[in-house]
């Protein structure tokens, strides 16, 4: 049994492959219950395009789509169902086909000890895919034998027996990018409280403490994107101080998200109708975040959920 994240082949996995095709391909395989799904989620958080349980014969077609002009797919991770008959031969065929495209895919094999796999299946009250009328232990043993040739040719073997989810994330980040320098995607979303709270918000801030431009006749029909409304909102007492303080708070939260391996954050800014104050503040906050953090560290976008709803 290997240690967590042991390199199985001679090819380094912690460096981006200089594939002539311009697309990096990772094939995630391994024992059922060893964490393939978790590994796929981490890769997705790192910006990889993830295809789950894609049949081997469709992998090259997916790669061809990624190589098409205009495609934004530069990193493709495929989670493969390795239990199908003839899988080892299929995997070899995929590697051969990709080699003709000047692509050398990396194979990640997820495994765990028999005791740990038994414990996980018992905790989830699920049967093993190969168990049939056998015992759970026999099903695990059968799959381990079936996948031995795949394991022997893997580029990276990750034993999750003693790994927490966080430790598994760190292992994958070290191999495939991310970690302390990973990009975090932040959505700054304006909304109106009268339409309800955003369900996907990680943080919610109420800016109804600022005077409402709705009560200024010449500003009422305009929105927070209008320079006159923006200047009115940002020029109010406390507005600049609020932006300074909330920006500092968000910077602390972003640093914490990065340490915890989280890659997505939604910050919701609310006012009464989501038309004036929240829009202006959300735009200003987005600009501050973009100015402080480079695009390589923080990807920021603004979303005005209720703009135009009146």
Curated annotation (Swiss-Prot):
GO molecular function: ATP binding; GTP binding
InterPro entries: P-loop_NTPase, RapZ-like, RapZ-like_N, RapZ_C
Binding site for ATP: 30-37
Keyword tags: ATP-binding, GTP-binding, Nucleotide-binding
Keyword ATP-binding found: yes
Binding site for GTP: 81-84
Function: Displays ATPase and GTPase activities.
HAMAP family recorded: RapZ_like
Protein name: Nucleotide-binding protein MAP_1147
Species in which this protein is naturally found: Mycolicibacterium paratuberculosis (strain ATCC BAA-968 / K-10) (Mycobacterium paratuberculosis)
